[in-house]
Amino acid sequence: MPHVYVSNALSGDIHVMQWADTGRLTLTSTCVVGAGPGPICISPMTERMYVAKRGEPNSLVCLQLDRTHGQLNLLYEMPLTARMCNLRIDRTGRFLLAVSYHSHSLTVCPLTPAQPAASNHTVMSTLRHPHAAVFSPDNRFVLVPCLGDDGVMVFGFDESRGQLTLHTQWQARAGSGPRHLCFHPEGQWLYLLNELDATLDVLAWDAAQGTLQHMQTLNTLPSGFTGKPWAADIHVSADGQFVYTCDRSSSTLAVFKADAQRGALTWLAHVPTELQPRSFALDVDGRHVLVAGQKSNHLGVFERDAQTGLLTFTQRLATGEEPGWVTCLA
């Protein structure tokens, strides 16, 4: 059965949830990891989950993952150089990339069966407030949205050694604050969510050259909202037909339809969510969207219409304190 994992920063645990035969999501177990668990990343190649703890000291927790029952067991915990806001594993499963907004850095960590040595970590500290990292579909590049630079840095990635080399930079609008991005499943378009003005950029991706070209900009906030923008997360459906974003100030999800030929987006709807949605996820079969309310300590469950992309609220489930990350696994 598919499982859902929610990291809870203040209660220091990860909630493991599972879909029941009734179609309702239920809590099945809780894994205590200590104060400050944040971003979660699941290895595509092994039975392991990695969680960045954002406290003193900052650390990376490695958990053994039971894909059948969803249970988690601690394997090791190792120090990190900084407070991390995003984790990604490359498509070979050999390297983990950790992003630190506060320390302006990227850390590349080789993944081994045993605990990696800290001396094997490569740290780059030439960026201004990077917030995420995404590997290109062919694993040749890493794209890093940098809120402080108002741009997306593109690094060449040597998957044999885990080495990053600055390749180029795409410049966003001043004050937009690039935060999170995701590729369209076909690989030729990229969707970039900007935190500070809550806009969404559609970019064309040249896989051969490793370059970006701007195509479109849209507003993700509901009409009439006058608060300060604070966009957080973005995901695209597996079929590439719909893009979803969230904003913490308005506590809403925005739904967009993607043009199959050009990748351009058309706004469809805004949906109210739990208070301050910092993270959300589409489940593995695309039937649900799960939204973590960072200030409500609840997970909102929405049923997703695969044909229209629209969402219907179906369930509210208690989490630990201050849920900041949600992810799904088959």
What is each model feature region?
Residues 9, 54-55, 101-102, 111, ...:
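Short loop/turn segments immediately following the C-termini of beta-strands
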Residues 142-199:
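Loop-centered beta-sheet repeat module
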Residues 26-32, 73-78, 119-124, 165-171, ...:
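A short beta-strand motif characteristic of beta-propeller blades
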Residues 29-93:
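Blade-loop segments of beta-propeller domains
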Residues 13-14, 57-60, 104-106, 150-152, ...:
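Structural signal for beta-propeller blades
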Residues 17-23, 63-70, 109-116, 155-163, ...:
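Short loop/turn segments immediately following beta-strands, especially the blade-tip
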Residues 34-45, 80-94, 124-139, 172-189, ...:
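Beta-rich, blade/repeat-based domains predominating
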